[in-house]
Amino acid sequence: MRCPKCGYNKSSVVDSRQAEEGTTIRRRRECEKCGNRFTTFERLEELPLLVIKKDGTREQFSRDKILNGIIQSAQKRPVSSEDIENCILRIERKIRSEYEDEVSSITIGNLVMDELAELDEITYVRFASVYKSFKDVDEIEELLQQITKRVRSKKSGSV
């Protein structure tokens, strides 16, 4: 593996462990020339999955698009990068188990919203406000009422 610091092609594995709920192997490596330590990840290459967009066009599934959307929605919220990564893993696992080669962007958006509703209500509202393209304040108010009902039912169920 090429060292990102000096470009030398030989490195040794210092530590290796499972990551991302067992779907990835994380390796700590050390460059044999300069001693720089760096991390690499080994992940199973999945078959290509196409996303059918709202306009009917198709593009390859990108977990990075989901990641970026969630990160943007979770800014300045108490949501860890591990929480986000686990959220994306659950979404991707569900998509790959239920859809063979194509899935609609609407389905993906709904799965993201379901995960965010459990993770953090504010992050959920931020994501929904972009994803749902609200036309007026009444639509946002309706969403907030749904969240409020869910939060209250959770609190009353845990008492």
Curated annotation (Swiss-Prot):
One Gene Ontology term of the molecular function aspect: ATP binding
GO biological process assignments: negative regulation of DNA-templated transcription
Keyword presence, Protease: no
Cofactors, names only: Zn(2+)
Keyword terms: ATP-binding, DNA-binding, Metal-binding, Nucleotide-binding, Repressor, Transcription, Transcription regulation, Zinc, Zinc-finger
InterPro entries xref list: ATP-cone_dom (IPR005144), NrdR-like_N (IPR055173), RNR_NrdR-like (IPR003796)
Cofactor binding mode and count: Binds 1 zinc ion.
Magnesium keyword on record: no
Family matches, as Pfam families: ATP-cone, Zn_ribbon_NrdR
Residue ranges of every copy of the ATP-cone domain listed in the record: 49-139
Family statement: Belongs to the NrdR family.
Protein name per UniProt: Transcriptional repressor NrdR
